[in-house]
């Protein structure tokens, strides 16, 4: 029997910025283009998943981002205790998607092969391509691999009935992962 999921968007951060800061190489039409930061909860009757882990207060301060609430607090607002989360899906390893290393102590992390290859490979030899990554996030994921807490996916994988991960055709780069819940009963913004 397949599950039906509710999708929650949990806003945890904000950055007042201009368009120049949103695009590699800048934007000649610079103007205000603020950015909000979200993690997602995919909540089923039988099982729930966290999609991306956000960043914590020290990382936000380092990168001059406003932390509106800690990710764990936002999850608790919808009834999810981070200590009991069993599955986390990481879309990609940018600092705002893969931080909070110890927030989910029991979780198994789902990650695309291509993403780990990208953030540990030759692309990181280029300073401009490293900007959205934090070495601590990458090494924390390597530690999770050695602790048998990472499940790698190569393209489309069903991780639960009606829930798949896949390599997205991303504007950022081809290695990003995208989850897709085929059956969503409702979508709520929190």
List where the protein language model places each region.
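Active-site metal-binding motif and surrounding structural segment of the metallo-beta-lactamase
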Residues: 65-111
């Amino acid at each position: 029997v397949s599950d039906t999921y509710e999708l929650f968007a949990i806003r945890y951060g904000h950055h007042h910025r201009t368009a120049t800061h949103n695009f590699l190489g800048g934007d000649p039409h610079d103007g205000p283009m603020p950015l909000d930061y979200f993690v997602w909860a995919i909540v089923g009757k039988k099982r729930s998943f966290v999609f991306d882990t956000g960043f914590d207060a020290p990382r936000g301060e380092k990168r001059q981002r406003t932390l509106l609430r800690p990710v764990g607090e936002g999850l608790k607002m919808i009834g999810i205790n981070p200590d009991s989360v069993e599955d986390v899906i990481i879309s990609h390893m940018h600092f705002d998607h893969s931080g909070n290393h110890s927030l989910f102590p029991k979780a198994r992390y789902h990650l695309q092969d291509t993403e780990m290859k990208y953030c540990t490979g030759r692309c990181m030899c280029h300073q401009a391509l490293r900007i959205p990554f934090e070495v601590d996030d990458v090494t924390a994921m390597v530690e999770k691999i050695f602790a048998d807490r990472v499940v790698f996916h190569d393209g489309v994988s069903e991780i639960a009935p009606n829930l798949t991960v896949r390599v997205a055709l991303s504007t950022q780069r081809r290695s990003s992962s995208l989850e897709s819940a085929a059956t969503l009963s409702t979508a709520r913004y929190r």
